[in-house]
């Protein structure tokens, strides 16, 4: 008995003794697995050790399990998500103190967690979640003191109806409807439309791949972070992670992301899809996680996924550049490629003078030097038979091509690419910024590659966006690329998506061109008759062989033909050695003539009139007008770079040519440098003297006109009434053309004498105009179809399309015949006011009384109904003076004007009210 009593006493003492002390540790909560389980990591180490703690004495509702994750799909138990979220929001990233114990028959470690470093003062997390009614307390056996406290807290939660004990909450409402998979991932990307969506990161596979829930619809996605790639786990032959192989910085990158994103509230911007994975940007409180990884050297930029990013690619590149310069982590062995750039080569601006086949241009600098500029990181359309290397060069030659192979026309889309550049750039100012120098290789010289901009737009990007060029693909560590490479890739993706140009599904047919420079037989029979009938034919100058010999492309007939300028004889230019033919020296000023013609017409839109062919029938001969409306034959003659050929005598342009030649001779220009004018043996009779001898009678041929403008010198502009419908048609087409193809502001540099399009201030419509003066950023223009003048900023001027330059001006300037304005300013203003009231914007009848060389023709105006002569009426009202003229044919009209003036003087009208104003011109008043 005593022994039994002693034994009982000992047993009772053992039960009353406190439990064995458990070890207390501190750490940071990394992850919340459920309402009763957390993962805590140590505060030191990268990555640090971790411990999973399950709360003692409580049981949380089980979260849903995705299919394939170790079993079949299961649903949330009611309140499971709320329980998990309570802990997540309270604990993630928070330093805690915890105790744990591992029962002998369990693989789990159970314990308690307190917020902070001191469990005596810190919040007991297990008690807090019980108090909220989000877990159940285990009630088996004799409860310990801690367990009894939890039971009491649970009873209080039940009584208060908190959490899962709420009598009003529906259990079904506390179960998530999770979308574990997506049949059409791209559709989900389209739904969110690139807008940030709230999300929670649930798992970090590696530094650049995570799994997340998109809220509030609980789409479960695997997300590859846009624009970057972090080191990841190596896979074995079965495609499973091979943990035996350690990839440098893989664990560090994953840890970096876990500490900032795992189970944090973030925003995700979905941008694309790759297989079943989504591609997007993760935004957290400190910005874009991709940018942070790059700055730490834990990630590298990836071109293909940067292309899908909406914004921020420049920041990613800058972050990677920072890590490279600091040689951080992955870049610890990085060696920068620093090619030496001359400052003049690096950045410059100039005018484009020639476009090559889709990938290069010639730019003339302010000092006259011409530089060949290649576009960075793009390649033009190419022969599909060729194999292209990573740097854009053909590394496997295409099969041999024919003797007359012309890649511009025979390679699909090459002509479209060239035309895009030609229309956009020729004779326009561009900015060139050097990106890299491509080293020389077999058959390819060194290339200077630039980003070329016009009006702030990247030309290469515009080409790629239209499907007229493709991007060069580089090795990931190759920095020799365009400074706007990411924009180029993005533009290419859009072109592919839109099936534009090279990316269209239909077969890329070549441009069918009839090359009449090779096959001459069809010129006379098939083409010449229609060209001769046409007043003007639109063409493109493809090549200039000499000052007067060109090769033109006629789009209407899709043919190439050699074109010789009519009416002139031009010195022969020099020729380099080519294909075994020795070099040939040119005639004096032959090269200057070649340069003159190249600068004005090479790759420009021109209009031509073809008269005939040469003797061999291999070339056509005709007249060519530049895009500014100048006759090129006349321009060459006037510059002293050609002389008039005898064949021009029967041409309608002979007089213009002779006048131009006389001017060149007088100025001793170029070929006329040593010209000595012959002394005339007989007196030269002027045109007016000839006319006086032959014509003694005044010719009357009234034309119906509308006066559109009156100048302060009493000249006026008039339009023929018969041409009104043609003018309206021309203006409608011009306005429509500029509306559909608006010019780039500032891309055109006007020069005095240019025929341009000007945007009129009052209605902002475009009209034909001639530049009369350029001062700084302003230009004074004459609207040639109306006669009014205006001073405009040069950015309101644009090159006039060739289709609108061939028609003559619809407004003609005349001087009011036989009258002169008074010298007094007030009298002058009164005369102009009266004349304007009589004729401005009115339909009147006009008769040319005298043709004057170099000045407006003299004309009289009369009322079509009353037949009143407006000039004589102004004289009769004493507003203007009658002019004394000596032409015999005008004698009768001059006498009538004098009689009207005498009557006004006697009546003391207007300017005569104080007497005879002509007496002021007497010698005693001078």
Swiss-Prot record:
Biological process, per Gene Ontology: mRNA catabolic process; regulatory ncRNA-mediated gene silencing; spermatogenesis
EC number: 3.1.31.1
SUPFAM superfamilies: Staphylococcal nuclease (SSF50199), Tudor/PWWP/MBT (SSF63748)
Reaction equations catalysed: Endonucleolytic cleavage to nucleoside 3'-phosphates and 3'-phosphooligonucleotide end-products
Consequence of changing residue 320 to K: Defective spermatogenesis
Region: Disordered, residue numbers: 1-24
Organism domain of life: Eukaryota
Keyword Transcription: no
GO cellular component: cytoplasm; cytosol; nucleus; RISC complex
General function of this protein: Endonuclease which shows activity towards both DNA and RNA substrates. Has a role in translation regulation throught its association with the with the RNA-induced silencing complex (RISC). Plays a role in spermatogenesis probably by negatively regulating piwi expression in the germline. Together with piwi, might be involved in transposon repression in the germline.
Quaternary organization: Associates with the RNA-induced silencing complex (RISC). Interacts with the RISC components AGO2, Fmr1 and vig. Interacts with piwi.
UniProt name for this protein: Staphylococcal nuclease domain-containing protein 1
Species: Drosophila melanogaster
Lineage of the species this protein comes from: Eukaryota, Metazoa, Ecdysozoa, Arthropoda, Hexapoda
Gene name for this UniProt entry: Tudor-SN
């Amino acid at each position: 008995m005593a022994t039994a009593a002693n034994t009982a006493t000992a047993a009772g003492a053992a039960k009353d003794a406190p439990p064995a002390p458990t070890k207390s540790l501190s750490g940071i909560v990394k992850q919340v697995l459920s309402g009763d389980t957390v993962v805590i990591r140590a505060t030191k180490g990268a990555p640090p050790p971790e411990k999973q703690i399950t709360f003692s004495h409580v049981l949380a509702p089980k979260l849903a399990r995705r299919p394939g994750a170790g079993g079949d799909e299961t649903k949330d138990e009611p309140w499971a998500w709320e329980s998990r979220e309570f802990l997540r929001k309270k604990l993630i990233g928070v330093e805690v103190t915890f105790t744990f114990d591992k029962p002998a028959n369990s693989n789990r470690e159970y314990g308690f967690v307190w917020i902070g470093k001191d469990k005596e003062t810190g919040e007991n997390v297990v008690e807090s979640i019980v108090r909220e009614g989000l877990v159940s307390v285990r009630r088996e056996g004799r409860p310990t003191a801690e367990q009894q406290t939890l039971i009491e807290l649970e009873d209080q939660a039940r009584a208060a109806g908190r959490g899962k004990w709420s009598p009003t909450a529906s259990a079904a409402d506390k179960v998530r409807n999770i979308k574990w998979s997506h049949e059409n991932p791209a559709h989900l990307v389209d739904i969110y439309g690139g807008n940030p969506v709230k999300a929670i990161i649930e798992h970090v596979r590696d530094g650049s791949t995570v799994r997340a829930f998109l809220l509030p619809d609980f789409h479960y996605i695997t997300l590859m972070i846009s624009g970057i790639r972090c080191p990841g786990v190596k896979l074995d032959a079965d495609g499973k992670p091979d943990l035996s192989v350690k990839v440098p910085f893989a664990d560090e990158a994953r840890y970096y992301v876990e500490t900032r994103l795992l189970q944090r509230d973030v925003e995700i911007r979905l941008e694309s899809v790759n297989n079943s994975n989504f591609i997007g940007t993760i935004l957290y409180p400190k910005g874009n996680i991709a940018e942070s990884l790059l700055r730490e050297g834990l990630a590298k930029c990836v071109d293909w996924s940067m292309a899908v990013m909406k914004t921020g690619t420049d920041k990613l590149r800058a972050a990677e550049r920072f890590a490279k310069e600091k040689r951080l982590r992955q870049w610890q062995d990085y060696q920068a490629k620093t090619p030496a750039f001359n400052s003049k080569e690096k950045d410059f601006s100039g005018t484009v003078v020639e476009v090559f086949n889709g990938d290069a241009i010639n730019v003339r600098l302010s000092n006259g030097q011409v530089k060949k500029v290649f576009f960075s990181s793009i390649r033009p359309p190419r022969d599909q038979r060729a194999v292209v290397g990573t740097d854009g060069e053909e590394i496997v030659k295409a099969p041999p091509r024919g003797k007359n192979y012309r890649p511009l026309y025979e390679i699909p889309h090459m002509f479209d690419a060239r035309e895009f550049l030609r229309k956009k750039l020729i004779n326009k100012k561009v900015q060139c910024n050097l990106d890299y120098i491509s080293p020389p290789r077999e058959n390819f010289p060194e290339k200077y590659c630039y980003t070329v901009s016009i009006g702030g737009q990247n030309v290469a990007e515009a080409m790629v966006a239209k499907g007229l060029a493709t991007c060069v693909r580089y090795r990931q560590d190759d920095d020799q690329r365009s400074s706007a490479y990411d924009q180029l890739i993005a533009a290419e993706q859009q072109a592919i998506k839109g099936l534009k140009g090279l990316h269209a599904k239909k077969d890329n047919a070549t441009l069918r061109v009839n090359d009449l420079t090779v096959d001459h037989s069809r010129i006379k029979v098939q083409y010449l008759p229609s060209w001769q009938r046409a007043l003007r034919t639109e063409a493109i100058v493809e090549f200039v062989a000499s000052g007067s010999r060109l090769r033109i492309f006629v789009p209407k007939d899709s043919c190439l033909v050699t074109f010789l300028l009519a009416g002139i004889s031009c010195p022969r230019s020099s020729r380099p050695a080519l294909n075994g033919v020795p070099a040939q020296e040119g005639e004096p000023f032959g090269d200057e003539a070649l340069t003159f013609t190249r600068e004005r017409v090479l790759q420009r839109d021109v209009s031509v009139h073809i008269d005939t062919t040469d003797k061999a029938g291999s070339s056509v001969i005709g007249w060519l007008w530049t895009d500014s409306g100048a006759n090129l034959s006349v321009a060459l003659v006037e510059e002293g770079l050609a002389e008039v050929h005898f064949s021009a005598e029967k041409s309608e342009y002979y007089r213009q040519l002779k006048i131009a030649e006389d001017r060149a001779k007088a100025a001793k220009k170029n070929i006329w440098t040593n010209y000595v004018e012959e002394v005339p043996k007989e007196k030269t009779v002027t045109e007016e003297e000839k006319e006086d001898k032959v014509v003694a009678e005044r010719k009357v041929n009234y034309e119906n006109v509308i006066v559109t403008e009156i100048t302060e010198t009493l000249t006026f502009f008039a339009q023929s009434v018969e041409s009104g419908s043609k003018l309206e048609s021309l203006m409608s087409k011009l306005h429509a053309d500029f509306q559909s193809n608006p010019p780039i502001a500032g891309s055109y540099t006007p020069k005095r004498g240019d025929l341009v399009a000007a945007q009129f201030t009052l209605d902002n419509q475009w009209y034909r105009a001639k530049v009369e003066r350029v001062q700084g950023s302003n230009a004074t223009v004459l609207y040639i179809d109306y006669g009014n003048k205006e001073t405009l900023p040069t950015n309101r001027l644009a090159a006039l399309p060739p289709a609108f330059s061939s028609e003559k001006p619809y407004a003609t300037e005349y001087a009011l015949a036989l009258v002169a304005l008074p010298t007094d300013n007030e009298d002058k203003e009164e005369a102009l006011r009266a004349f304007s009231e009589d004729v401005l914007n009115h339909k009147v009848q006009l008769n040319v009384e005298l043709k004057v060389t170099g000045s407006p023709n003299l004309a009289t105006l009369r009322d079509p109904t009353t037949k009143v002569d407006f000039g004589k009426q102004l004289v009769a009202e004493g507003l203007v003076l009658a002019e004394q003229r000596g032409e015999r044919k005008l004698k009768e009209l001059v006498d009538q004007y004098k009689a009207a003036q005498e009557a006004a003087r006697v009546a003391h009208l207007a300017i005569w009210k104080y007497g005879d104003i002509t007496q002021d011109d007497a010698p005693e008043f001078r």
